[in-house]
């Protein structure tokens, strides 16, 4: 029973996502964030981005699909930059019963016990979502990074693509000309940490909100040990909470999953 629940939880989450789809400087004229101008603040955020090549963690995942209470499972989260994001569910004695794998080619959801799987290429996902949905967007969300749709790497040359405005102790960053989607990021001006990412379908109430909490040290940087994903616009609230432990940058693991024949 548990392995079926895990498999359907992974599938439901992916379908819902597709459907909803301390430095000091002199004050400059124009918009200012603390002691920095708008462009200086963005430059600092980009230059200080950790850019980890890999991240692994033990994971506790709580999924609530109808507002009646979460279903909790344990497992592992593994990521290799520009290659793969793996979510492995192993509720009993470390035995994997389900896996979700996101790669630049698409999304694979697998029921290990019954050798069943769902595999969808990103080209098909883009058509379903009517937007530039790709691997690098999902990678940025999982890796706690600001991103620009359609770009693999964010550089200081992209600063003009963002609008920044102060919001109490935070800075609200929005992507200009986001086509079908509105992209918004909230960072803390004291430490520059990304606290929230939001993707909304323009002109509708549908969207996804990704909140980051409980930051922990990871190679002299900070990574969120808690991520809360909320899918907006559905009749019933849908949330997924990732609680992470034993954070590491270990790269010694198999990047891709063999599909059973």
Predicted feature locations:
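Bacterial N-terminal signal peptides that target proteins for export
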Residues: 1-10
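C-terminal motif of bacterial Sec signal peptides marking the signal peptidase cleavage site
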Residues: 17-20
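Bacterial signal peptide processing site
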Residues: 22-25
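Post-signal peptide N-terminal segment of mature Sec-exported envelope proteins
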Residues: 29-51
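A short, Trp-centered hydrophobic/proline-enriched beta-strand micro-motif
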Residues: 46-66
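An acidic-aromatic
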Residues: 84-136
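Gly/Pro-enriched, hydrophobic low-complexity segments
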Residues: 154-260
